[in-house]
């Protein structure tokens, strides 16, 4: 699978999320890259962070499926990273991200409550532990006293 436009390798070099293919020359370059990747045998192509008309033109001109991530509706399929869908990041999202839930706050609250319960001795409680038959427990304690167990 090929990947053009914004790629993980270019993020730091570009200084973060930057749209690719905004000029005619850059858009033509992306099309050339797409055709070259198809030619070398890519079975599909991710088009990331590019203007929708550029992604649509690429999709119309290559014979392999395109998956868009911030590339508009003209691709054959869409990608949205699950961390973004669920709102797990505490940061400003790229323009193409639509957050469907804010689980970050829920998750942080859950871990804080867990920590508080452990520190206060409320977890684990009896209902969270496995019991032992009284006779077996007494036999085990006797074995410990006799030095039979370790």
Which residues are covered by each model-predicted region?
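Alpha/beta enzyme core
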Residues: 1-95, 101, 105-150
């Amino acid at each position: 699978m090929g990947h053009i436009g914004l790629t993980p390798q270019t993020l730091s070099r570009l200084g973060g999320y930057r749209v690719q293919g905004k000029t005619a020359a850059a858009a033509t370059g992306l099309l050339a890259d797409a055709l070259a990747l198809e030619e070398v045998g890519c079975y599909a192509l991710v088009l990331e962070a590019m203007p929708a008309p550029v992604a649509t033109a690429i999709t119309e001109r290559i014979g392999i499926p395109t998956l868009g991530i911030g590339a508009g509706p003209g691709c054959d399929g869409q990608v949205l990273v699950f961390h973004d869908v669920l709102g797990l990041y505490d940061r400003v999202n790229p323009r193409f991200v639509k957050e469907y839930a804010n689980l970050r706050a829920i998750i942080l609250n859950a871990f804080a409550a867990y920590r508080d319960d452990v520190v206060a001795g409320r977890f684990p409680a009896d209902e969270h532990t496995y019991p032992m038959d009284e006779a077996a427990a007494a036999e085990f304690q006797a074995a410990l006293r006799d030095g039979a167990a370790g």
